[in-house]
């Protein structure tokens, strides 16, 4: 295992431990790190165990969030306009799955939107102050900087396929991100 992989693994375990025993926000930060670093597809991640890193992070964060008491002054997450839209659209995707023209791509899309709902729930429940919003946005900026650094140092001419992480590994979705 490379030194980079060992550091990633140590930070991953630390982030999940902090999420469970201190504050679930660390699980969300770990999720962002796993998304942007995309360890299984990097040269330094070859020695890491074959895990569903994002799923494990989301599961641990969800378990850690169970101890949070709902804020009586906030609208429940599922009653916000974006959540209603996401839920309705995702349900519609699953309903129309049997007659989709490209069942495999349609299934991937439905799964992706289901994941968006879970991440939306986590972000809505955990990011509740301006300081946490700034920290969350900073984590995204740092992740985007890392992807930009990978793109800049890659030996790819033309389209940047394979530079991004999970779900953004082709040049079109990476560009949208």
What are these regions (language model features)?
Residues 30, 56, 119-120, 149, ...:
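A general structural signal for well-ordered alpha-helical segments in protein cores
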Residues 42, 108-110, 125, 131, ...:
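Membrane-interface segments at transmembrane-helix junctions in multi-pass inner-membrane proteins
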């Amino acid at each position: 295992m490379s030194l980079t992989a060992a550091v990633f693994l140590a930070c991953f375990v630390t982030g999940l431990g902090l999420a469970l025993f201190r504050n679930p926000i660390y699980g969300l930060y770990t999720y962002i790190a796993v998304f942007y670093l995309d360890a299984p597809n990097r040269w330094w991640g070859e020695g890491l165990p074959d895990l569903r890193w994002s799923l494990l992070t989301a599961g641990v964060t969800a378990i850690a969030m169970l101890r949070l008491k709902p804020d009586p002054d906030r609208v429940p997450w599922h009653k916000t306009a974006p959540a209603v839209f996401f839920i309705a659209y995702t349900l519609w995707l699953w309903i129309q799955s049997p007659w989709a023209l490209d069942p495999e791509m349609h299934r991937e899309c439905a799964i992706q939107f289901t994941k968006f709902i879970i991440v939306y729930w986590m972000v809505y429940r955990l990011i509740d102050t301006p300081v946490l919003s700034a920290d969350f946005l900073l984590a995204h900026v740092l992740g985007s900087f890392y992807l930009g650094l990978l793109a800049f140092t890659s030996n790819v001419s033309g389209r940047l396929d394979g530079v991004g992480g999970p779900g953004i590994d082709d040049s079109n979705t990476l560009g949208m991100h």
